[in-house]
A protein has these predicted regions:
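C-terminus-biased signal that marks the final domain/tail of proteins
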Residues: 1-212
């Protein structure tokens, strides 16, 4: 679905030659960046590994068919993802050196991951730790789970149960990597009072956001 005359206008303005397939992200996207980010890539690659998707590709499929059944736990795990243990782990090489003494008094250097390195560092902290690495910098990645997330949810549909309880929204406030998920059933006509209070712009101890 697109605006009437879009292709004709794009061709008239020189954005499209009329010969190549009309790909919206190529014709209209003004930054020229790829039409996907590492978040899209990571989810699709995880669900369909045999496709051998890579970040070097020009574009990714809009969707993929999961190669295995996807459970509720799988979905929650993806929403908590920070790429820890993968090649995109931003903290894996943020090491610091500390001098320690052995039992015999011999001084030596020990290298360990900085206790300041974690998956939700501020930009300033990330740059500070990166500055200690010399020329070999770690690229900052946009993780799926982020501290500035307002909320996330997973919809589960269970057709073998009555509609009132078969449909459930697993709701999470704030960072999906740190907050629990609360079931909100399709048959509910009301929610707890704390879910009716907005706590995004101010501190409200009676808001579910600040509880979680």
């Amino acid at each position: 679905m697109y605006s009437e005359g879009l292709k004709e206008k794009a061709r008239k303005l020189g954005y499209w030659d009329g010969k190549e397939p009309f790909k919206f992200w190529k014709v209209i996207h003004e930054t020229g960046k790829k039409p996907f980010t590492i978040r899209d890539f990571f989810v699709l690659k995880t669900l369909a590994p045999s496709l051998n998707l890579t970040m070097d590709m020009e574009e990714l499929p809009l969707s993929v068919k999961p190669e295995q059944n996807v459970s509720l736990a799988d979905m929650n795990r993806l929403l908590r993802e920070t790429y820890e243990g993968t090649e995109w782990d931003m903290t894996k090489d943020m090491m610091v050196t500390k001098k320690i003494k052995d039992k015999d008094g011999t001084e030596r250097d020990t290298i360990y991951k900085s206790p300041l390195a974690q998956n939700w560092m501020t930009n300033d902290m990330f740059e500070f730790l990166n500055a200690q690495r010399g020329e070999k910098k770690i690229e900052k990645q946009r993780t799926i789970s982020v501290v500035w997330c307002a909320y996330s949810f997973v919809i589960q549909c269970r057709d073998w149960l009555p509609d009132e309880v078969g449909g459930v929204c697993w709701w999470s406030e704030d960072n999906p990597g740190e907050s629990p998920r609360v079931p909100l059933f399709a048959g509910m006509t009301d929610v707890p009072e704390s879910f009716k209070v907005c706590g995004h712009k101010r501190y409200r101890p009676d808001a579910a956001l600040w509880t979680y």
